Regions:
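Conserved FAD-binding catalytic core of PHBH/FMO-like flavoproteins
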Residues: 163-234
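Glycine-rich FAD pyrophosphate-binding loop
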Residues: 8-10, 22-47
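N-terminal glycine-rich dinucleotide-binding loop that anchors FAD/FMN and/or NAD(P) in oxidoreductases
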Residues: 45-70
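N-terminal Rossmann-fold NAD(P) dinucleotide-binding loop
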Residues: 16-17
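Rossmann-fold NAD(P)-dependent oxidoreductase module
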Residues: 22, 113, 117, 188
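Conserved N-terminal helical subregion
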Residues: 57-61, 72-170, 178-183
Length: 234
């Protein structure tokens, strides 16, 4: 008889890992299932992920923030240029009790940090490189591994395997889709004069952001409306 978990979580990305860790701190038992290899990610690339100060407070509250492991750059000042206006707005951390406005983190290093914590947690059983099928969605929920006779059981099932989740389709879960008719691009480049500052520009052709990676480089993110794609030499 397989051990029954409180929660079964399918999908070991940022949402799946974070959900598992928060539930584990409430002393629930979790089986975290990931289709790919669940391991520390080694990468020299910087993929920016913006976190608000409230998100960082939440992570710190649950002991899930460690600046020595996570590649992060604080945002102390945000400059916003509005569409169809000459107005420029500036937000400064000095106006908010001296706290940073947020941070730009490297997605890979943040996910690696969460993965390492999941693997060390006694309340989380990680099953990776696994394809599973749903046998029963009534409690206890049962999932079976397609390449073995193993069965995973739990009281609750949480699906976090992405927007195109096959599990959600199989369970006929309702969803809403929004088409912004945009294509996004991201570039990293050397630039030394944007220490802890970020820019966001709204224009007729799209939304542009300049985000600090570190003291030596920035990420440029452009979300272009598809009708204007040909105006740019990306």
């Amino acid at each position: 008889m397989p051990k029954k978990n409180d929660f079964i979580i399918v999908g070991g990305g940022l949402v799946g890992c974070l959900t598992s860790l928060i539930l584990s701190k409430k002393n629930y038992t979790i089986c975290l299932i990931e289709k790919k290899t669940f391991k520390h990610i080694i990468s020299d690339n910087f993929t920016p992920l913006s976190l608000t100060i409230n998100t960082i407070h939440f992570l710190k509250k649950h002991d899930l923030w460690n600046s020595s492991y996570i590649k992060a750059s604080e945002i102390k000042e945000l400059t916003v240029k509005l569409f169809n206006s000459f107005n420029i707005m500036r937000f400064c951390s000095d106006d908010l009790y001296g706290e940073e406005l947020g941070s730009v983190v490297d997605k890979s290093s943040f996910l690696s940090y969460l993965i390492d914590n999941c693997k060390k947690c006694k309340n989380i059983n990680v099953v990776d490189e696994a394809d599973v099928d749903i046998e029963s969605i009534t409690s206890p929920i049962k999932l079976s591994q397609t390449d073995s006779k193993s069965t995973i059981t739990g009281d609750y099932l949480i699906i976090t395997d992405g927007a195109d989740s096959q599990f959600a389709k199989n369970l006929d879960m309702g969803s809403l889709s929004f088409n912004y008719d945009q294509t996004s691009y991201m570039f990293n480049t050397n630039y030394q004069h944007l220490s802890k500052g970020a820019f966001q520009i709204f224009s007729k052709k799209g939304i542009f952001a300049i985000l600090p990676c570190n003291d030596q480089s920035v990420s440029i993110v452009a979300s272009i409306y598809n009708e204007f794609i040909d105006d740019f030499a990306f």
